[in-house]
Structures are given as C-alpha cells and as structure tokens.
C-alpha cells in the first residue's frame, strides 16, 4: 500500500487532537491550546509546510504567550526553520517520530472495540494511568471519551485482563489514513503483549478499509523501539522546540 503524503498525515493528527483541544489556523500554520490540559503537548503549534514555518512560529509564539503558556513549536527536521529557531531563542526539548505500518504487527493479547454503552470513565482511567500514573484528570478526559464514542471516523479499542481495562488505543480515520493515538498500557499489565494486541487489531481494521496505519511517538516516551519491532517504519521526524524563558 502506498504511504500517504505528509500533509494528509499531519491533518489526521490535528483532526484527532482538535477533539481534545482547540485548533486555530493561519494559512498553513496552526496552534492547539487547552484550558483543561496545560501541558505543552496540548498547547503547541506548527506548520504544514516548510515555507510557512517562519511566519507560523512567530504567530504561535504570540498566541501561546498571550495564554501564559511557554511557546512550543514543532518543526519538520528537513526544514531550515528548526535550525533558525534553535539559533535564536528556542531549544530542542524532544523529537516526534511519525511512523507508518509496513508489515504485520504480530503477537499480543486480544483487543476489542468499545461499544457506545461502555464506561467512558473506565477507558479514560486506563488512558490516564498509562500515561500519567494517576487519574487526576479523569473528569475532563471521560467527557471527551464519551463524545468520541459517537464521533465519526473514531474507533476506541481496549484490551481487558483480570476484569479491568489493561490497555487502550484510539483510531481516527481520514481519507486514506487510519491514525493511531493514545496507545497505552496500564503499568501493572505491561510486558504482556497488550500494546501489540491493540496494534494488531488496529492494523487489521486499517488493512480491511484500505487505509495506511500511522502513528506519532515522542522520543522521550521510549516507545520507538517497540513500534519498529512491530513492523512500523519512520516516515519523517519533527523537532519539538520551546522558547527559552528569560
């Protein structure tokens, strides 16, 4: 299957996170921001093209500074914008790798789709425990999950063990693309094939629909090796840049 172009993958990602945070555009530049989730991941900007990166970075900086947030900008590694920003007042905080599935995932525990009647609290709890280690934000996350049950193009998957949700994964579909998000395993269920099982189910769904399965992962999360071992390959990378605070 032919891999989707970069713009299609980026629009899929932004379409997904616009369900969690507010999304604003200026030409090919964008900014995400949230009052509920104050971490940089939900308060960041970027550009769909290299040409628009410089003006987009200036606009994103103003927009996030007005919200009392540290300006965070994601720049394609093959754009000179990353070099220019780091040469001025930005520092690299992380790297985001964008991957596509290029073969069978293989192995893993079984996963099932979540029905609209299922508990949004339970899915949200597993997501938060997987990524944050606590459930402090279960209220706002459960509210989003509840709306996702009925959102077009979204499928929520879960893997259960010992009577509870052991891992979660979300699929968001756009033209030709099935984006995978929120791949998480609850700590006490790790190293038991939970994530592999979820990815296997997602791969089967994407293949059946004729879509490319793609995902993003941050270098700091330490999951890149897992995905590479499960048949994914790197399409491109983005520098996660933050403005130095004076």
Sequence positions of predicted segments:
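A short beta-loop-alpha structural element at the N-terminal edge
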Residues: 1-6, 51, 111-125
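Conserved catalytic-core motifs of GNAT/GCN5-like acyltransferases
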Residues: 92-102, 233-246
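N-terminal charged segments
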Residues: 1-67, 78, 82, 150
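Conserved acyl-CoA
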Residues: 58-68, 173, 197-212, 233
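Conserved active-site alpha-helix within GNAT-family acetyltransferase domains
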Residues: 79-92, 196, 219-237
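Conserved acetyl-CoA-binding loop-helix of GNAT-fold acetyltransferases
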Residues: 53-61, 182-185, 191-204, 229
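Conserved beta-strand-loop-alpha-helix junction that forms the acyl-donor binding cleft
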Residues: 73-80, 214-224, 241-245
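A conserved beta-strand-loop-helix scaffold within acyl/acetyltransferase catalytic domains
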Residues: 137-186
């Amino acid at each position: 299957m032919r891999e989707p172009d970069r713009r299609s993958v980026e629009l899929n990602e932004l379409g997904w996170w616009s369900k969690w945070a507010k999304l604003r555009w200026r030409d090919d530049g964008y900014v995400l921001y949230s009052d509920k989730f104050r971490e940089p991941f939900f308060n960041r900007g970027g550009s769909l093209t290299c040409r628009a990166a410089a003006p987009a970075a200036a606009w994103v900086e103003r927009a996030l500074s007005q919200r009392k947030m540290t300006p965070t900008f994601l720049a394609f590694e093959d754009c000179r914008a990353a070099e220019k920003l780091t040469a001025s007042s930005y520092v690299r905080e992380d790297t985001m790798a964008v991957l596509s599935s290029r073969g069978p995932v293989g192995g893993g525990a079984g996963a099932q789709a979540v029905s609209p009647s299922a508990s949004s609290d339970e899915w949200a709890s597993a997501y938060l425990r997987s990524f944050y280690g606590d459930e402090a934000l279960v209220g706002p996350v459960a509210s989003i999950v509840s709306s996702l049950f009925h959102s077009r193009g979204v499928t929520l998957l879960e893997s259960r063990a010992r009577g509870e949700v052991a891992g979660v994964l979300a699929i968001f579909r756009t033209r030709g693309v099935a984006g995978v998000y929120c791949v998480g395993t609850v700590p006490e269920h790790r190293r038991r094939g939970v994530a592999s099982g979820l990815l296997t189910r997602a791969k089967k769904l994407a293949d059946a629909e004729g879509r490319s399965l793609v995902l993003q992962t941050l270098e700091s999360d330490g999951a890149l090796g897992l995905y590479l071992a499960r048949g994914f390959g790197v399409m491109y990378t983005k520098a996660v840049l933050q403005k130095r605070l004076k």
